[in-house]
């Protein structure tokens, strides 16, 4: 199944799950409100998601004078990829990480943390930037942002529904009450699994395209391992407060528990590194 169709079906599943929760809360009216809320959320995500997520992480514009290495790398690789240079931002956070956002290549931005700039060498930084540019080129940024918006909304409405309960008819029926409780408890987990299904193929593809763009798959592999290792013990408090946005980052920014790791929105680093090492056996720059 083509990735575009598969992603569309998964996003439709998220919307259906959101509407189902609305139906449990208020039957037909609740479902209609949930559908309208989902549509409005996606509309807002399309137009202002980049500004919202950048503000959420306190990202500041990176200028050439303060961050010459970063800006030069982004401009060089964007030109090589045939993309307009995205806006570049820096987040004051010790955890090395990065993400891209924006509805299309003409309205895109790349944000990196100060921890990333201090932890990676030139080749490794180029690999990370190329990875994010790949997301921009193939409009993964829009897909991941809309998915994160829906997943976050599902978690929020599930918590509200558990607190306030469903309709009177639902509360009067033990079976309906149990079924509804299961729906509300499992909905956020299901949303995370859908995020994982969308993210997995897109992260692998972005890794491969980044390696092809730079011609240095091992540099990206080293970067992924270093980011993953440091993310385990260097917290990202903003990401912990907004876990639905974790899928935007190149490496999962959440410290988490073993249970959380099982349902992380990123494919395992060891698998990503193994694929890059396999690519290194060939002249990826000619692919």
Swiss-Prot record:
Instruction: Name the EC number(s).
Output: 3.4.24.-
**Annotated binding of Zn(2+), by residue:** 131, 135, 203
Is Hydrolase among this UniProt entry's keywords?
yes
Q: Name one GO cellular component term.
A: plasma membrane
Task: Copy out the cofactor comment.
Answer: Binds 1 zinc ion per subunit.
Q: In which compartments does the protein localize?
A: Cell inner membrane
Q: Which Pfam families match?
A: Peptidase_M48 (PF01435)
Keyword vocabulary terms for this entry: Cell inner membrane, Cell membrane, Hydrolase, Membrane, Metal-binding, Metalloprotease, Protease, Transmembrane, Transmembrane helix, Zinc
BP-aspect Gene Ontology terms: proteolysis
Please tell me where this protein is predominantly located.
membrane
Q: Name one GO molecular function term.
A: zinc ion binding
Residues annotated as transmembrane: 5-25, 28-48, 146-166, 174-194
Q: How does it sit in the membrane?
A: Multi-pass membrane protein
Active-site residues from the entry:
132
Required cofactor names: Zn(2+)
Write out the similarity annotation.
Belongs to the peptidase M48B family.
What is this protein called in UniProt?
A: Protease HtpX homolog
Q: What is the lineage of its organism?
A: Bacteria, Pseudomonadati, Pseudomonadota, Alphaproteobacteria, Acetobacterales
């Amino acid at each position: 199944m083509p990735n575009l169709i598969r992603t569309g079906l998964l996003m439709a599943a998220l919307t259906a799950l959101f509407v189902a929760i609305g139906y449990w809360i208020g039957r037909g009216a609740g479902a209609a409100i949930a559908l309208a809320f989902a549509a409005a959320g996606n509309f807002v995500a399309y137009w202002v998601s980049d500004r919202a997520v950048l503000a959420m992480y306190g990202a500041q514009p990176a200028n050439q004078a303060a961050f010459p290495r970063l800006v030069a790398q982004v401009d060089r690789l964007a030109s090589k990829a045939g993309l307009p240079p995205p806006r570049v931002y820096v987040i004051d956070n010790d955890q090395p990480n990065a993400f891209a956002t924006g509805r299309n290549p003409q309205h895109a931005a790349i944000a990196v943390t100060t921890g990333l700039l201090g932890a990676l060498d030139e080749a490794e930084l180029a690999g990370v930037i190329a990875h994010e540019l790949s997301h921009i080129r193939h409009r993964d940024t829009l897909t991941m942002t809309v998915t994160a918006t829906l997943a976050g909304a599902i978690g929020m409405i599930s918590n509200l529904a558990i607190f306030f309960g469903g309709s009177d008819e639902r509360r009067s029926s033990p079976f309906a009450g149990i079924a509804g409780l299961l729906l509300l408890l499992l909905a956020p987990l299901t949303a995370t699994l859908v995020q994982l299904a969308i993210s997995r193929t897109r992260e692998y593809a972005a890794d491969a395209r980044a390696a092809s763009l730079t011609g240095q798959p091992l540099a990206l592999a080293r970067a992924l391992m270093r980011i993953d290792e440091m993310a385990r013990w260097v917290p990202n408090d903003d990401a912990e407060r907004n876990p639905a946005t974790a899928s935007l980052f190149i490496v999962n920014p959440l410290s988490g528990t073993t249970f959380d790791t099982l349902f992380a929105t990123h494919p395992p680093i060891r698998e990503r590194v193994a694929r890059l090492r396999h690519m290194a056996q060939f002249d990826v720059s000619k692919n």
